[in-house]
Amino acid sequence: MKKHGILNSHLAKILADLGHTDKIVIADAGLPVPDGVLKIDLSLKPGLPAFQDTAAVLAEEMAVEKVIAAAEIKASNQENAKFLENLFSEQEIEYLSHEEFKLLTKDAKAVIRTGEFTPYANCILQAGVLF
């Protein structure tokens, strides 16, 4: 049994398989998942796991070079917007309209569905490299 890091075997495999510029999505409970994109559903009940907890764990495990979020998060979910800016203070954060954001999710390797019940609590993490 694994002692450290991500224990979810599906999520651990996706992260291990990522290459430079590959994308994964951290999604709230309501974000639609495009047909053909793998959904890793972590949701247990409203609020669990939270968007912030999930993003923090992924930030520890993944080389992230860029973050993409819906611009609407800044006005409608300031707590999570500030959280993203603090967590990814050394990475570029690009803001798009929510509709543009949803279109980009079709190119993701996976959508990780959380139990988050706040608006626009979604982001796309673009993989970087360690060298």
Swiss-Prot record:
The protein's enzyme class: isomerase
Keywords from the UniProt entry: Carbohydrate metabolism, Cytoplasm, Isomerase
UniProt-listed Enzyme Commission number(s): 5.4.99.62
Cellular component, GO, one term: cytosol
Active-site residue numbers: H20 (proton donor)
Reactions accelerated catalytically: beta-D-ribopyranose = beta-D-ribofuranose
One MF annotation (Gene Ontology) recorded for this entry: intramolecular transferase activity
Record-linked SUPFAM superfamilies: RbsD-like (SSF102546)
UniProt family annotation: Belongs to the RbsD / FucU family. RbsD subfamily.
PANTHER family per the UniProt record, alphabetical: D-RIBOSE PYRANASE (PTHR37831:SF1)
Role according to the record: Catalyzes the interconversion of beta-pyran and beta-furan forms of D-ribose.
Name of this protein: D-ribose pyranase
